[in-house]
Amino acid sequence: MFKKLIKRNKTKISHNDDLDLHNLPEHVAIIMDGNGRWAKKRKMPRIKGHYEGMQTIKTVTREASDLGIKYLTLYAFSTENWSRPENEVNYIMNLPVNFLKTFLPELIEKNVQIETIGFLDAVPKSTIEAIEHAKEKTKNNTGLKLIFAINYGGRAEIVQSMKSIYDELQRNGQDSKDIDESMINKHLMTHSYPDPELLIRTSGEQRISNFLIWQSSYSEFIFNEKLWPDFDGEEFKNCLKIYQSRQRRFGGLSKE
């Protein structure tokens, strides 16, 4: 079964008009993987790969916005990424500043709203200021919600939600019998977003790396072979077409 899944993820659909604009996922999440390997293949510093990856974010954001997708969540920096070399971490942490400096006017024009999930208290002040400025400038926009997961980890998110639930139970005189899925959802960082129907990971790696582990329970996974800087609008649309070829069962039986 797993071999069939991998084979299907490599499927290519060549014609753009095969994309059904009335059957798009509402929420797409992407693990943007392969920046370092892209740079290494070209004998360039790893930070060059991250720079080119930033350009891909612009491309995919434009595509998602133009197609009318409502939510795009991008795994920008995980809670585990702090173990990387200091100069690389510093460069990645400064990328949102550069990204928003160059791209914010277009995001505003495209009616895109910037939001974040993650533990931002550990993020540098200059990065936080750039993000908060972008949030303020786009807070009334009603198009695509572009959600950056920064210093985010799925396990840490669940631990935080459990602590928050415990506090709520204590305040309200409740006990563990009152805990259900809706209560957990309410205390997650993503509580105001629908679960992603589609989760894409680039670079050919086939794992979710602690990303949206609660929310992706019924997501369709596509493991794309392209390194993130090489992922473009056509690859994004091809992933959407593969998604449309799937039948989502949510644990039930096929309708066929």
Swiss-Prot record:
Cystine residue pairs: none
CDD domains, per database record: Cis_IPPS (cd00475)
Signal peptide range in chain numbering: none
InterPro entries: UPP_synth-like, UPP_synth-like_CS, UPP_synth-like_sf
EC top class, as a word: transferase
Reported cofactor(s): Mg(2+)
Active site: D33, N81
One GO BP: polyprenol biosynthetic process
GO CC annotation, single: cytosol
Sites where the protein binds substrate: 34-38, 46, 50, 78-80, 82, 84, 201, 207-209
Assigned keywords, A-Z: Magnesium, Metal-binding, Transferase
Residues the record lists as binding Mg(2+): D33, E220
Domain of life per record: Bacteria
Family matches, as Pfam families: Prenyltransf
E.C. numbers: 2.5.1.-
PROSITE patterns membership: UPP_SYNTHASE
MF annotations from Gene Ontology: ditrans,polycis-undecaprenyl-diphosphate synthase [(2E,6E)-farnesyl-diphosphate specific] activity; magnesium ion binding; manganese ion binding
Cofactor note: Binds 2 magnesium ions per subunit.
Assigned protein family: Belongs to the UPP synthase family.
Function field: Catalyzes the condensation of isopentenyl diphosphate (IPP) with allylic pyrophosphates generating different type of terpenoids.
Subunit structure: Homodimer.
Protein's UniProt name: Isoprenyl transferase
Biological source species: Staphylococcus haemolyticus (strain JCSC1435)
Source lineage: Bacteria, Bacillati, Bacillota, Bacilli, Bacillales
Gene it is expressed from: uppS
